Amino acid sequence: KAFQLFRAAVWEGDLNATIYCGYCCKTGAGLEKPNIVAAARYYEYGARAGVAAAQYELARIYIDKEMGDACFIGGANPYIGCERWLKKAAEQNYIYAEELLADKYYEGAYIVKDVKAAIYWYEKAANQGSVYAMYQAGYVYYTVPIDYNKAGQWFSLAAEKGNKDAEDVLRNHLRYNRFTKKWDAIR
């Protein structure tokens, strides 16, 4: 019943309902069985209309290759689809897209590896309150390019928000004087 209501809402112009229709199709909720191709079509409809959550969900389908290599909408390349839709959602400040886009840039998965772009998107998400992105920004600065002051700042912010991994990093590395004394209180 819920799917039919969401589908009716889409027909009446509620583009946000495309997210719910896509979810129902992807999971099979309210339907006889899941239908990933139908889910992708609903997400694409919302994505093309500028719905950030639909853009993000469509990118996730490309990443997960849930439809198989040959079944992408219009024969689209999953690598191109992933980056395209994640960027569109991230540019609308959709925090989950910012985090995932940064992950993909850092890993070089589905997108050409670009550490500067990863840092940009992690910091953007972190500045919106993402504790995950705060930790990840610290991790990137701790590894490549090495900047212990920035790493310490991001780890500290993540630790202040309750991220246990960031607390552990700060505790373990204070003894090497890699971070400034500001973080001594965390010992």
Regions found by a protein language model. Name each.
Residues 11-15, 27-29, 48-51, 65-66, ...:
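Short helix-capping/linker turns of helical repeat alpha-solenoids
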Residues 18-27, 57-71, 100-107, 111, ...:
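Hydrophobic face of amphipathic alpha-helices that form TPR/SEL1-like repeat modules
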